[in-house]
Amino acid sequence: PDLLATAELLHCAGRVASLVFEPCAGFEALRQDALAPQQAYADYLRGQINLQSIPLLPQAQRAAAAGDANALKEIADPLSQLVAAGVLLQTGKASPAVIGQAIDTASSQGWRRPLLAWLGVQLKRAEQGGDLQEAVRLRRRMALTQGRALPMNQPRHELLSDTQKESP
């Protein structure tokens, strides 16, 4: 059960890195027989770690689990970086710098799914902040990432979502 629990947690960590926040059902079925560090990590992935359990987490995740968004820069492993960024986002502690770093990390690794998810977060923030030029740029980047390039001369209003279209 120990190896199976670890495998389930790795699967769930990958989903958190891609901003898929859902229960880790595979692990939850094994929780009662799992080791304390595995249980702590599962709680962390849900954004529900308690302070007493932080020392049980992998070293790379401890500072981020304590809410230190600056710790992301110190995490060497790209997947661990994205997991920490995902947890920070899930708990409402992801700054624009965290989002930017997550985008850079996913992009540099060539990981399309996490990149699209993080670009989507940045797009939503740009739209909410009324930065239409940034929203257009992000939509173009997302289209390129998905393998469908948008023409550079496409009218701006066609790149905006229906709710964000400029008024005449």
Identify the function of each model-found stretch.
Residues 4, 77, 95, 108, ...:
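Residues that mark the junctions of alpha-helical repeat units in TPR/alpha-solenoid scaffolds
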